[in-house]
Amino acid sequence: MAAGAGDRIALETSDEAYRQMDERRDLAAVTATINPVTGPVYVEGAEPGDALAVTVHEIRLTGHGWSIYLPGVGALARPMGAEMFVRKVPLDDAGVHVTDRITVPAAPMIGCIGVAPAGAAASTVMPSYPTGGNMDLTDARPGATVYLPVEVPGALLSVGDIHAVMARGESSFVAIEAEGTAVVSVDVVKGLRLRAPRIDTGDEIVFVGLGDPVQESIARGYEDAFAFLTGEQGWSAGDAYAVLSACAHSELGGPTGSTTPDPLHPLTPIGAVTLHRFPKALL
């Protein structure tokens, strides 16, 4: 698929892997791709050294989602134990029916969004990459624009892993996973060299930090915020330092890590994804 700057496209995603988990209750019996993405989309005019701006206009959900526990994965692995858990979660106009008693508003978002790296093929599960990937950030939602560094001609955008709702950080390693359609538009920002993704939510600029250990991830995210203020916005170093210290909030991002995991433990993250939020009202 090819798209030009400003084109709006609809990308359908699949939840077949979760259907199979529900039916078979055995991860080894799942034949569908886990965390599949739709794409790639070749964006005309995108070249290495540019940034691809992906604006999320709409996320259409189907009538259900999934709550999944994979044994040994996520922050709740110890209390959940060795048995797989799968729950089909109804979605309707009232919201997301997480339990029989608790219904919460839907807050659809894109868990996996990225462009092709210049090197080897990237995983759609973990880790997160400078070019994006399975970042699992609640900010990748309708109304936001995700900026991704382009490393290959055409950028080659892919999107997947839609969530009906997700707690920030996705500490359990899954959200309420859902099938759906993401409606996005693409633009090319010539010469905007990024070393990690950036998100404009409308109210904030969110800088994604990637590094190992977590302190390195935090430092890199803050450095990118500092470079944005002093380079793109023309602030003095002193002003940028003082305002970041006073007003830029940090938090953990998605749980997928920032470094390729040990092959013997492919779902154990290494490194960290962090987020650094700067209020646009201060620009």
Segments predicted by a language model, with ranges:
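Short, Lys/Arg- and Gly-enriched loop/turn segments at beta-strand edges
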Residues: 16-27, 59-68, 154-164, 253-256
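Intrinsically disordered, low-complexity linker/loop segments enriched in Gly/Pro
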Residues: 36, 58-142, 147
